[in-house]
A protein has these predicted regions:
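Solvent-exposed, well-ordered loop and adjacent helix/strand elements within mature globular domains
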Residues: 1-182
Length: 182
């Protein structure tokens, strides 16, 4: 997660934005939960909760991923995407910047996942490519910014549904060869 909000012990809310990465490739910690006989790990939210319930083992698992992200405090409503502007819940999407330029409109046709509190349902809408991330590689991967709060966290943690995406280019733009062959 490249940015977000944290609540300090004194109750203040601080916004954080991406400031850099240590250069190591991202490695999912998901497979390591089996070594600790963790059951029922089906989403990122399940992983987070297990790590909180098992502090004696959490550091050992987290350190398996040598990729670290550094943050800075930011002003405004945040979070700020890689494009340099505030992300809009359920309208901003993170993409592979080597394939899609920031600002590209992308139509998404997928479904929202079944979660603890929501049923699976169709989800179709227009997004704008405004962010990127270390795990987003290729034309068929995108991460929707669902916003803050319990709903946003739950949807983001469970979302792994397949779907279709359509990059929308004006007629006047010469479409790169990559898009013609994929």
């Amino acid at each position: 997660q490249g940015s977000g909000r944290i609540k300090l012990n004194d109750g203040r809310l601080v916004r954080l934005g991406y400031a850099g990465q240590n250069g190591h490739d991202y490695k999912s910690i998901g497979p390591y939960f089996k070594e600790y006989n963790a059951t029922g790990i089906n989403s990122a939210l399940d992983m987070i909760e297990w790590l909180h319930r098992n502090p004696q083992d959490s550091r050992k698992i987290i350190e398996r991923n040598q990729s670290y992200v550094f943050f800075r405090t930011i002003n405004g409503d945040g979070p700020i995407g890689a494009q340099g502007i505030s992300l809009i819940p359920e309208r901003s999407i993170a993409i592979d910047k080597a394939i899609y330029p920031y600002g590209t409109p992308i139509w998404i046709d997928t479904s929202l996942p079944k979660t603890r509190n929501y049923i699976e349902r169709k989800y179709r809408r227009l997004f704008i490519a405004q962010d990127t991330g270390g795990a987003i590689k290729g034309a068929i991967r995108g991460d929707i910014f669902f916003g803050h709060g319990k709903r946003g966290e739950e949807l983001a943690c469970y979302m792994n549904n397949k779907g279709k995406q359509y990059a929308l280019f004006p007629k006047s733009v010469k479409i790169p060869n990559y898009y013609r062959t994929h």
